[in-house]
Amino acid sequence: MKALILVGGFGTRLRPLTLSFPKPLVDFANKPMILHQIEALKAVGVDEVVLAINYQPEVMLNFLKDFETKLEIKITCSQETEPLGTAGPLALARDKLLDGSGEPFFVLNSDVISEYPLKEMLEFHKSHGGEASIMVTKVDEPSKYGVVVMEESTGRVEKFVEKPKLYVGNKINAGIYLLNPSVLDKIELRPTSIEKETFPKIAAAQGLYAMVLPGFWMDIGQPRDYITGLRLYLDSLRKKSPAKLTSGPHIVGNVLVDETATIGEGCLIGPDVAIGPGCIVESGVRLSRCTVMRGVRIKKHACISSSIIGWHSTVGQWARIENMTILGEDVHVSDEIYSNGGVVLPHKEIKSNILKPEIVM
């Protein structure tokens, strides 16, 4: 069985992290975002994943080589020479997705994090006998999104309404699809939208069905949503695999600490914190609602909240980092510095306070 992951372009919304790595390789909960998806696909019998990409394919493939061997799954790239939207990449990868078996294939948006109930989706797809299945999720403010109007009893999709001014429903496209090979015949090789062009055609022919996603869902393509997504992911881990979370007298709420990280005495860590491989957290540090990526050193009595600390950075003693501060790779914050929402590009040294949200070049 095959799957296509829509990787897309430059990840500008997640800069400065994406200045060092393509967005799917940015760590989320201590492993690359895309690895969460590849592992979920492997678990339901997918043996080949095609990455639809237009930026740094060689970096992606080199990085994922080890995981290809470890997970026993084939990973290939389909490279766009121009942006093809959300449907064009399927036409471009047609030969990689068709193997003559007639089996459906998965399509995933690489920005989406969820519990990936792909086994249930396979069963749902077989049960309705339609041409395509999409996953939908309920949201509080549907007017920001394209809303999927569906028949509640069967799941059959009636129509899509883009950013409705009046309430028509609260279910939106969750960016996870299961498609029969025949769907590829409906997509031309040009820049085109699967949501606005392909799916409405299939829905008009009564062949499109929607399954309501159980559990959490988040598009983590920008920093604020990334932080929220981490909270939802750790909540889910607490319910499903609590042994993976860290516990102890210095831990508050849900915290994920890599086994190679070290934490000093008198720290208070949590809630909603991920600490990556090789990190050193010195004594008296306070961390909450943040991600600390691989190889970071946080010195004594520093305080970090609602922020992302990029790979191999250093935060000085008594420094205070908060309010969606994002440190790129290899950033060094001096002792006693305050950052209020600073976005700091890689390889910088911060020697003066950042008093309001700004980009430090």
Curated annotation (Swiss-Prot):
Please summarize what the entry says happens upon disruption of the gene: Embryo defective arrested at the cotyledon stage. Deficient in N-glycosylation, altered in cytokinesis and cell wall architecture during embryogenesis. Mutants vtc1 and hsn1 with reduced enzyme activity show reduced root length and leaf cell size, reduced accumulation of ascorbate, increased sensitivity to ozone, UV-B and oxidative stresses, increased levels of abscisic acid (ABA), salicylic acid (SA) and resistance to virulent pathogens and root growth inhibition in the presence of NH(4)(+).
Q: Which pathway, per its entry? A: Nucleotide-sugar biosynthesis; GDP-alpha-D-mannose biosynthesis; GDP-alpha-D-mannose from alpha-D-mannose 1-phosphate (GTP route): step 1/1
Keyword tags: Cytoplasm, GTP-binding, Nucleotide-binding, Nucleotidyltransferase, Nucleus, Transferase
One Gene Ontology term from the biological process aspect of the record: L-ascorbic acid biosynthetic process
Tell me, in one coarse class, where this protein mainly resides: cytoplasm
Reported effect of changing residue 22 to S?
A: In vtc1-1 and vtc1-2; reduced enzyme activity and ascorbate concentrations, and ozone-sensitive
**What EC number(s) would the UniProt record show?**
2.7.7.13
Gene Ontology cellular-component terms listed: cytosol; nucleus
Q: Which reaction does it catalyse?
A: alpha-D-mannose 1-phosphate + GTP + H(+) = GDP-alpha-D-mannose + diphosphate
Tell me, what is one Gene Ontology molecular-function annotation carried by this entry? GTP binding
UniProt keyword 4Fe-4S present: no
Mutagenesis or variant effect for residue 89 to L? In cyt1-1; deficient in N-glycosylation and cellulose, and embryo lethal
Under the heading Gene3D superfamilies, the entry gives: Hexapeptide repeat proteins, Spore Coat Polysaccharide Biosynthesis Protein SpsA, Chain A
Q: How does it assemble?
A: Interacts in vitro with CSN5A and CSN5B, but in planta only with CSN5B, which targets CYT1 for degradation in the dark by the 26S proteasome. Forms homodimers in the unliganded structure. The product-bound structure is composed of six dimers that form a dodecameric assembly.
Q: What is known of its domains?
A: The N-terminus (1-40) is necessary for interaction with CNS5B.
Functional note: Essential protein during embryogenesis. Catalyzes a reaction of the Smirnoff-Wheeler pathway, the major route to ascorbate biosynthesis in plants. Plays an essential role in plant growth and development and cell-wall architecture. Provides GDP-mannose, used for cell wall carbohydrate biosynthesis, protein N-glycosylation, as well as for the biosynthesis of the antioxidant ascorbate.
Entry's family note: Belongs to the transferase hexapeptide repeat family.
Name the record gives this protein: Mannose-1-phosphate guanylyltransferase 1
Q: Which organism is it from?
A: Arabidopsis thaliana (Mouse-ear cress)
Which gene produces this protein? CYT1
